Amino acid sequence: MKTKLNFTGQAYDSSVIWIWLPLFLVLGLLVTGTQAIASSACAQTSKAALAACTSSATSDYWLGIGACDNLSDRQERQNCIDEARHSLNKEDLKTCNEQFQARQEVCRDLGGGPYDPDFSSENFVSNPADLTGNSYFPLTPGTYTYKSKDTAGNTLQTIVVRVKDDTTTIAGVLCRVVTDKVYEGAGTGGRLLEDTIDWYAQDSDGDVWYFGETTIAFTFDEAGNPTASTEGSWMAGMDEAKPGIIMFSVPEDQIGLLFRQEFALGTAEDLGRVIGTDASVTAGGVKYTGCVHTQDSTPLEPGVIEDKYYTPGVGLVLTVDPDGTREELIP
């Protein structure tokens, strides 16, 4: 083990630098990322999320260091520290930083104030018969089938969305129940990959709000055994989660503006931006005109932007992912 002298003339282990390196890194990210936006509520939220992310990313490292502290032999302790240091996942720390920077960009775009929308029940329709959505996001009962295709035209997934007659109450607000099932392959006979229940509400201006979801995603090992995850589930009013607007009744007034579609920090942070209201697209062999074009993103996946197109009287007809994958409504 190398031993050096500090400025007091006392000996210290150079390994100490490596032990505290993750903490120095976290502090460095906090200082660097907050220079542009002083101490606004939005910036403080970004810092809190960064701290949570880095804490998770360095948890195994610090537990390893704690175990090393209980080794009496210096060389064994040093070897233990080296092993713990090499177990540190730098990619996870990089992701934490990228998410932090993405949240800061959102703060610059939305302003530094807190996200605290008024979703009191008196601002929303309370009669199920009135819960019909708007022209670009209908909430009338019905079934929509989408096919997800790669750039070669191969069908990767089949998505079945059902707007149900059922309603429920979330945070005191009447919501329409919508189910969303994702199947592997070209039909509903493939493996179920995702099973989601969404909740949508409508305010007195006709804007459609997203009040949360409960979702189960399935992954499969080589033997075909499934593993289920509920990651991404959230509900407005629970654990400080808040709803957002999924579609404005007059999207023309929102062109170019960023807006939150949901907010459960670290779980659900989708945002939308209206790009235009007169797009023309072809999906499922049908040409649609006068479409609202939005771009959706989330700080949880920095740099990933989805282009979505909504046509009057129908709703969502096309989603285009960054890799060119197209999710098309099938008539």
Annotate each predicted stretch with a short phrase.
Residues M1-I17:
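N-terminal secretory signal peptides that target proteins for export/translocation
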Residues Y12-S14, I37, G256, F263:
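Compositionally biased, intrinsically disordered low-complexity segments enriched
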Residues G28-L30, T45, S72, D307:
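Residues at the start of alpha-helices and the adjacent loop-to-helix junctions
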Residues D82, K94-P331:
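Conserved functional acidic sites
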Residues I19-T32:
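Bacterial N-terminal signal peptides
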